[in-house]
A protein has these predicted regions:
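Mixed-charge, Lys/Arg-rich low-complexity intrinsically disordered regions
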Residues: 1-17
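Intrinsically disordered, low-complexity, charged/polar segments
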Residues: 2-4, 49-75
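Intrinsically disordered, low-complexity cationic segments
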Residues: 10, 27, 69-70
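Basic/aromatic-rich interaction segments and small domains that mediate binding to polyanionic partners
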Residues: 26-62
């Protein structure tokens, strides 16, 4: 898995189930995407649901102008 600064920043529409993601804002939270809701319209938003390495459930919502860090791509 990549370090925080090495992970590429990509558009939310490029995230797939199985990817390990985190926000571009300062955080060390990473989680594996289990389900994606979206895009919702006006404004376009994607909500990602998943679990972190400790098994805790996580979710984040990203907008059209946001970027997401992808630490590992789904195989």
């Amino acid at each position: 898995m990549q370090d925080l600064g090495d992970a590429p920043e990509i558009h939310p529409s490029k995230i797939r189930v199985g990817d390990v993601i985190g926000a571009t804002r300062p955080t060390h939270m990473r989680y594996t995407v289990k389900m994606i809701s979206g895009p919702q319209t006006s404004p376009r938003r994607w909500t990602f649901f998943g679990s972190d390495a400790d098994g805790r459930q996580q979710n984040d919502t990203f907008g059209e102008d946001d970027l997401v860090r992808r630490y590992a791509k789904a195989s």
